[in-house]
């Protein structure tokens, strides 16, 4: 039979596909997303992960993957040196590319924010504000019962900041919500679920009548 030539996909082409789903320009200005190492390299396999750690790089090597796609950026603060044993050093040493989709993936339709809202059993999920998603519970819950529902749905410990009122409409922000509670409040939400929230932001939200359930972003 005739030989068929198959063009190898490059890391940049992989990033372009991700960018069509979660546009890179939608990332926050402080974020560091896109191809963080090895744009022109061919892709022999892709490993997907939340964080690129040394263990993840070693797994990519073991599996023969030449690219790793992660949610959290492997390079966030400016690097002054490549320290042996760290993830950026190991990526460079083994010639493995890194593509990171962070806040752009949080905001994307069908992205992390929508996935969180779906996991909580919300219906009528829609954007509200720059980052927040809003949806409705199947039935009204009191704050303690709602916190237990969130903990069971996500399988992580949660912290409840109880504003005392029943909960039916819920706003969610994956990652660190902090001041974004105001978007949920402005959208007439009864509660706000996020992965991280500073103490003073939580107190401000409670004073405004918004119950907050805070998960564990690092888990």
Tell me what each language-model feature is:
Residues 3-219:
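Hydrophobic structural segments
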